[in-house]
Amino acid sequence: LGYYMDDWAYVFYANLKGINSLQEMLTYDSRPYAAWLYMLGFNILGFKPIAWHIMSLLMHWGIVLLLWLLIRAVWPNRKIEAIQISLLFAVYPFFMIQPFPIAYTHIWFGFLAFNLSLLLMVWAIKVNTIKAITFTVLAMILEAAHLFTGEYFSGLEFIRVLFLWILISREEPIFSQKVKKVFLNWLPYLLVMGAFAYWRIIVFENPPEITRNSPVILQQLFT
């Protein structure tokens, strides 16, 4: 086990230019708020490939566990299906280049934060008001964490509406009230997503000499 392909860019910056230089590197990569994750990783794990591989594997299995808990929370009677889906995700988590121990840390973190955020949202629907507020706030923090660390899961955020609809439909038979409750429960997460979209499209600017991956079409819609 070692480092592969994109891993070496992180190793180069952290080793030759200092761990704090990862902030510069990821700003050029259009993900300035992902730097904290890699800086923390190098400060804790150092430059030993085996340490990064173990951390990657632990995050992977943490995601699988959270996915299983999420499915069981939404569909308590679907025990077999929950295991099957979780095991399928363990083998194929929607991308093929899993052996990279460093370069895709923000992907694993995104999955981890996203799944935990969804689970907390589901719990918030099922408990009393005080606990619901606590779970909702924690879910919003995790939503912001995964969005600002990497934008990959921004589209998946719309899955929240589906989960909310399923859960609220079980308790509310009237369609108009169902729509209202789903929207009100989704609104806090929609505000977080809106704040991220505003920052990413309007506020954030790449360094002057860097133009790749710029959301030109989206920016033109707002200018």
What are these regions (language model features)?
Residues L1-T223:
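Polytopic membrane enzymes that build or remodel cell-surface glycoconjugates and lipids
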